[in-house]
Amino acid sequence: PGGAAPPAPRGRAARGAAHAPRPPPPPPRAPASAPVIGTPWAAGPGTGTGSPSPGAGEGAPTAPGPSPGGTDRGAGDPGAGDSGAGRAPGALPFDLPGPAALRTGEAGRKLVFAHYFTPYPLSLDNASADADYYARNYLNPAGENGKHERYGGLLRDRPLPVSPKPGDWERANLEQEVRTARAAGLDGFTLDMLSLSGPNRDRAQLLMEAAHAVDPAFKVMLMPDMTSLNTDDPGVLADAVAALGKAPAAHRLGDGRLVVSPFKAEAKSVAWWTQVLDLLRTRHGIRTAFVPTFLDFDANSARFAPISHGFSEWGSRSYVGQESATRDVQRAHGLGKIWMQPVSVQDARPNQGVYDEAGNTATLRSTWTHAIDDGADWVQLTTWNDYSEGSQFAPSQHNGYTYLDLSSYYLTKFKTGSWPKIVRDTLYVSARTQFASADPTGPQSLVMSLRKGSAAPRDTVEVLSFLTAPATVRTEVGGARDAHEAPAGIHSELLPLRPGTSSAAVVRGGKAATEVELPYAADRTVRVQDLQYYAATSGRD
């Protein structure tokens, strides 16, 4: 990307297979110093001072039409549809505006999508979570006949377990994911088009149907994956895009153009992409807005500018080097293009032997802050559910709703222009369950090493507090008790990781009112390497 840390390129493969080797990253730029994360934001976001409470209310349904942010929306409230799994009362430190407030006016022009990766839906076989495909084959190092044993198993986390369902359970589960994303304030998904046929293609079609059924205003941006789609024929890709692009859920601009945002667009030439776009128009009657997502924006922006409506980049996954996003947005806007900013939480890939140091929630907060401060037009959360990269924002077994809940806070500022007022104390605790230098004792032979350009490894527990007023925060890490004074608003406190569990509590008047425990214990001796940060929030059970 345009900064110190190289991008996090990815390989793609069908469900159950290890990803293909990832392409080499471009040379890193000069390293940048990490942001200060152990101090409060001076007069910063979340204090409620000078920030009016945004939005309210919901109304009638909108007619199908262009995606939020368009000019031909039609009358009515885009927040209508199946309310599904709404937000738990009191889950967030602030009151999240409803879809009506987040999808109209200026807020409706700032769009937030999450990258949906079809190999990892809520369930792969509709079985009980303790014995389903995830448990037997992806989390188990011996799963799939030992094909993942070399790197300790394909995954380290999984979607929050769901109960087996009667009938069309795959469709029902996809609808549940749409409801979850909608309840967090998201405008839609970017759909990774991995293959032209097979289970991933079938699931892509089902997602388009599920999105429209739950909420006609929830849109799906098509993202042909040029690391895995096995075709050099522009006509084949044009046909594949058209087949999904005709669905009502497909993301279109207000003028009716279908948004197409290929992943690693630079894998094909500008001339090749011009043929694809021409065929979509002449063969299928589809006008397009081309928003290529690059692994290397610097090297490709000028060449692609004549055919592009906007640009995006996959981005890096560490909190250092993110200041380059400022220049990327400026360059895109200078070329008259919109910019879709990648926002990430972490990245750890056992099957590729690489990870980035996310610094607890530092990467999430840094990437969101750049999207806000630098004037990005759209945001892509990278990713919703790619568990093989450990980059998931979606509710998961080891993180619960923590990362999605935190994103809702920054999303509100991004879309409304105002920091939401903190109305209830909320604590977030994050830590690894092992030390960064731990050497696994099991048969794992491929271990993850730090990606070049990443921040240095650290062994820390972070207590991130959102407080309505100053308070004492009492902590316990591996039996070591401590306390610190936290100001109103947001405060990040770092503590050394110790073997055992971690917990925190807000104390006022000698009484603990808000408490959180990260139940996953850290250990110095581990059988399988796992360098993801686990997280918990006091806002949810």
Locate each region found by the language model.
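N-terminal low-complexity, Pro/Thr-rich disordered segments
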Residues: 1-90, 94
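Glycan-processing catalytic domains of CAZymes
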Residues: 84-459, 468-541
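A short beta-strand segment in extracellular, disulfide-stabilized domains
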Residues: 462-464
